[in-house]
Structures are given as C-alpha cells and as structure tokens.
C-alpha cells in the first residue's frame, strides 16, 4: 500500500470504515472530481433527483444504518438540503454533509463566483450550517485535514447529530498519510468511571423497589442514545406498565404483556391520564418534550416522582446528576437489580391493550367506506416481523400511533421537525439501508412500508424516481383524502389553500421509468375505495411479498381524521392564535396545574 493517498480517498474510506455503504447526493461542478473516489472506496453512489430529497434520504438511511453521508455543491446545492439537515439535527440523525466548495485561492481572493451571493463572502453558508450541525470542518490544511475529518465523524456518531465538511476543489487530490486509516475512529459510547455511578444506581433501585404504582415511558431519543436494548430489557424484566410516546413507538417490543400502547395524555384514553398522574414513580427514557410528542405537553411527568434518562445525565426526583452516561448506568441497574424486590403491579386492562382491541374489531362490510377510525388498527394485520414502517406527517403519523406492531419492527415518524414530504425520500434511504443490512445478516427479513398522504407525496414525488433507479423494495400506501386534511382541521376546513391538484398517483411509476413486466423488479399498483377492495388487495401475494415498487391508493373522505388529531388541533389552533401564552406560574402551583395551563 502506498504511504500517501489522496485526501478524498481518505475521507470516503473513513466513511466506509464507520459503516456507511452508500452515498446520497447530487453532482455539481464543485464536487464532481470528488465523486470519482466513491466507487474505488467500496461505496455505492445513489444519485438523487434533487438535494432536498438527498438530505431526507440520508436521514432515513441513518435511522436504520446508524450513520449516513450526503454530498452537495456549494451554495445552491447545500441550501436545497438545509431543511433536511435541520430536521436531522432536531430529531438526532447522524448525517455527514459533505459540500464541494470553490478552490481556496478563489475564496481567499473574494472572487465573484457562480453559486455564491456575489459579494465575495464564501463563509456565509458555512455560518448557516454551523447552527444546525454539531461539528464543522473546512479541509484547507493538508496537515490537519485527516484529524478534522475524524473529529467530525466521531462527533456525528457519538452525538447523533449532523456534521458539515467543506472540501475545496483544489484539496481533492492533496496527499495525506495512508497509515492513519489503520487506526479506526473510536466510536464507543463512554463508560462511567468504576464506582462513580454507585450512589445513583442504589438511589434508582431503591425508588423502584419502594414504588407502589410504577410506570415506564420510552421516548424516541432512546434509540439515538444507543440504549434501546437496555430499555427493552428494563421493560421485560421489571414487568412495569409501559407505554411509548409517538416518537418512541416501536423501540421496545410491543408484544410484551405489560405494554399498553401509547400514552396520549389529554388526547387519549380518558382513564389512562388520571392513572399516570397517580403513579408514584415514572421512569422516562430518552425524552423529547415537544408539543407534538407530549400531546400538548400533557404527558410530561411530575419531576418529583420521575427518573429521566438523558444521554449523559439523569434526573432523579427533579435533581440533575451530571456526567452519567445512560448506557453504562442502565447496564449497571439491570445487572444489580433484584427482581424479587420489585413491586408486582398489574394495571387494569382499562389502560388499553392494542392487540385485544384489534381482535375485538368487527369485520367491516364489503362496501363500507375506508375510515380513519379503524384503518390504522386493521392495517396492522398486514405487518410482520422485520418490517420498517414509516408514517408521514399529517393524518398518517397521528393515525399511525394506533398501529399494532409485531416484534422486531421499526417505526419511523417525525415528532418535532414535521416537514411534510420527508417520508417518501426517507423511505428510499431506509429501504437501501435495510437491503444492505439484510445481506450482511444484521437485520431480520422484512419490508419497507410507507404511509404517505397525497399532499405530502406531491412535495417530494421525485423520490419515486430514486427508488426505481436503485431498484429498491418499497410498499407505499397513498392516503388520498383530497388535500391537506390536518391543516383543514387546524384552520380553513373549506379554504382553497388547503386544496391540491388531483394527481393520477398510480401512473407515477410509469412516468418515472419503472420497468414493465420485469420479474426482477415487479411494479404493483391498485386502488381501494371500500374495505372489500382493500382487503382483497392486501391478500394479493405480490403485495405480501413486498418486492419491487408497490403502490396502493387508499381513498378516504376529505374531512375524515383520527379522533386524537381532532383533539390535538384544538389546542394547536388556540396556541397559534395567541390565546394560550406560556403561563407565568407561581412557585406554589402544582405540576398538574402547570401542565394543564400549557396544554390548554
């Protein structure tokens, strides 16, 4: 092996070392020479129709694979992707954004170059990126470039957030020492010092042993912090009643007998919220306390009775214990925990059992219209172990909270960024990562299944072309309710601005060049207006197999929406109008008073 290699070869081989196998992006004159290094480094080039979709797809890939990379060109390219990168920051997806930039001498000379603002300032876009990434590097110095790359990649993986790397065109072929590649980047999660966590472990265990009515809530950052297995084991071993948030759905095994669906606060089961408020111990893992994820802030537990696990600190009874890494802390708790001392508490079935509710549903009539009220439960019979299930922002993400998931499934939704159109390109990235990992024996066999609204699909429809180009297996249920239904419920039920142009959705695969009658990549398209039609479609072997591109258009009425959505939008409307200002509470106000004031 040569003693020195080109800087871009070093960069791409590092990406391969940390587990990335494919690169998303769009070619541009500032990154073209860099793209020549992708295949020699053992990476695949995806090639997206636009940069926004490339960013969304990289995010979806990262949520399955753990980390991803997207390449754009300076200025016009990177700004097209910035919405996606901001979403990755907000929801903690590890995306490496590589930007091909103008040569260093051009930048230093303030030359009026294309794709710039024409003012000679080549730093403005990097300054924007710094607000939505956890680490940045401008690879200008050959002596420090490799260390800068390693620093950014390490930060991306360990902090579960995007990073930004600038690669000037005149640095692409700069020679750097090859031997650095022999030492892998340390991506291990930090361990707590021996004995350092003992006090906190004992404090937590004693609270668990003495509790009379315990409750576990698993939230979405649990997976980002790398503690999904520990959370699942805690749920299984304790037998404590467990729920998830919307963002946390699918992280723990939902077939456990002590799993009671989603805790929806003021928008959910009327008996669940009073019961949860009466718990003397709430263990919350990986919290994201956004308005959407907490149902208008109504599910945030009282700090005095809570143990909350963050990435590198824990809150016990409202007291913050710093520099405690949750993975190490949870492993110690699980190792030391005496299950015989735990309370043997069995909650009432009134708290909800999704599987029992699904089994109790009476079969619909053949000619009955497909409805939001039961669709999400009934469609759960279509799922199997290993599936990746994705629900787009809107009625699909809210309805998807009622899905009944088998073991070993993954559910992807958005619970703070909520950029409609995200899920279609994200499904491309997720399906690609799934295919890679199944081939490596790292995932169960399964399908990628997307529930996409008609309005959302129109935002990012070119992603269908990317799916077809890469021959990915994706099953898409297009929920056609003739416009922006969630916006109608928030404001403007009959307003024209919530209407969209009707499309012939099932003709999209043909328009985007999908093959016809190719057994290696089958294309399946069907339309359902009634339950009889939908059930017949769901039973078709081609759809069950999930190979190739499958599109099922599901017709629903324009104003039909999940009941929980109708409850949520009432508080959203009041908050948006200014009727609900964040309260100035006295120190004597109870936690419940504070929460309900905020929630409205």
Task: Locate the predicted segments by residue.
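Active-site diphosphate/adenylate-binding microenvironment
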Residues: 8-11, 16-18, 26-36, 350-441
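Phosphate/pyrophosphate-binding active-site segments
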Residues: 2-3, 140-143, 179-180, 203-206, ...
């Amino acid at each position: 092996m040569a003693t020195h290699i080109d800087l871009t070869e070093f960069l791409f081989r590092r990406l391969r070392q940390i587990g990335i196998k494919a690169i998303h992006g769009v070619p541009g004159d500032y990154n073209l020479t860099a793209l020549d290094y992708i295949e020699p480094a053992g990476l695949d080039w995806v090639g997206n129709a636009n940069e926004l979709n490339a960013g969304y797809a990289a995010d979806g890939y990262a949520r399955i694979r753990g980390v991803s990379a997207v390449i754009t060109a300076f200025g016009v390219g990177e700004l097209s992707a910035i919405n996606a990168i901001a979403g990755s920051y907000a929801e903690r997806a590890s995306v490496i954004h590589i930007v091909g930039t103008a040569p260093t001498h051009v930048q230093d000379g303030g030359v009026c170059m294309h794709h710039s603002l024409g003012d000679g300032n080549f730093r403005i876009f990097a300054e924007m990126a710094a607000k939505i990434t956890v680490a940045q590097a401008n690879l200008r110095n050959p002596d420090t470039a490799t260390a800068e790359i390693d620093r950014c990649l390490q930060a991306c993986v360990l902090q579960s957030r995007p990073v930004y790397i600038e690669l000037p065109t005149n640095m692409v072929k700069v020679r750097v020492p090859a031997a650095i590649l022999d030492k892998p980047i340390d991506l291990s999660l930090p361990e707590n010092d021996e004995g350092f966590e003992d006090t906190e472990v004992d404090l937590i265990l004693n609270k668990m042993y003495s509790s009379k009515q315990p409750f576990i809530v698993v939230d979405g950052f649990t997976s980002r912090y790398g503690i999904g297995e520990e959370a699942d084991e805690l749920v299984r071993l304790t037998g404590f009643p467990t729920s998830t948030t919307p963002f946390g759905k699918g992280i723990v095994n939902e077939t456990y007998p002590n799993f009671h669906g989603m805790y929806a606060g003021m928008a959910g089961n009327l008996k669940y919220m009073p019961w949860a408020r009466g718990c003397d111990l709430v263990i919350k893992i990986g919290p994201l306390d956004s308005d959407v994820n907490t149902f208008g802030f109504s599910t945030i537990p009282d700090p005095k009775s809570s143990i909350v696990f963050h990435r590198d600190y824990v809150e016990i009874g409202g007291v913050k214990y710093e520099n405690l890494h949750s993975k190490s802390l949870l492993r110690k708790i699980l190792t030391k925990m005496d299950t015989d001392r735990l309370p043997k508490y069995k909650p009432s079935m009134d708290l909800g059992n999704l599987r029992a509710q699904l089994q109790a549903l009476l079969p619909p009539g053949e000619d009955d219209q497909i409805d939001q009220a039961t669709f999400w439960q009934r469609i759960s019979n279509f799922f199997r172990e290993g599936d990746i299930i994705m629900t787009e922002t809107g009625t699909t993400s809210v309805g998807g909270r009622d899905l009944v998931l088998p073991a070993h499934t993954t559910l992807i939704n958005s619970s703070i960024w909520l950029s409609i159109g995200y899920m279609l390109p994200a499904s491309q990235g997720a399906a690609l990562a799934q295919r890679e990992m199944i081939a490596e024996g790292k995932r169960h066999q399964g399908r990628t299944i997307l529930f996409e609204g008609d309005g959302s699909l129109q935002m990012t429809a070119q992603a269908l072309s990317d799916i077809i180009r890469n021959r990915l297996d994706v099953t898409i249920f297009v929920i056609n309710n003739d416009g922006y239904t969630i916006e109608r419920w928030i404001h403007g039920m009959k307003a024209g601005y919530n209407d969209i142009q009707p499309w012939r959705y099932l003709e999209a695969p043909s328009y985007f060049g999908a093959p016809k009658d190719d057994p290696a990549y089958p294309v399946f398209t069907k339309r359902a207006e009634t339950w009889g039609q939908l059930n017949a479609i769901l039973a078709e072997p081609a759809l069950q197999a999930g190979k190739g591109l499958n599109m099922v258009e599901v017709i629903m009425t324009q104003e039909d929406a999940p009941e929980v959505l109708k409850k949520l939008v009432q508080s959203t409307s009041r908050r948006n109008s200014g009727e609900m200002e964040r309260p100035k509470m006295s120190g004597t106000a109870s936690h419940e008073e504070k929460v309900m004031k905020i929630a409205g």
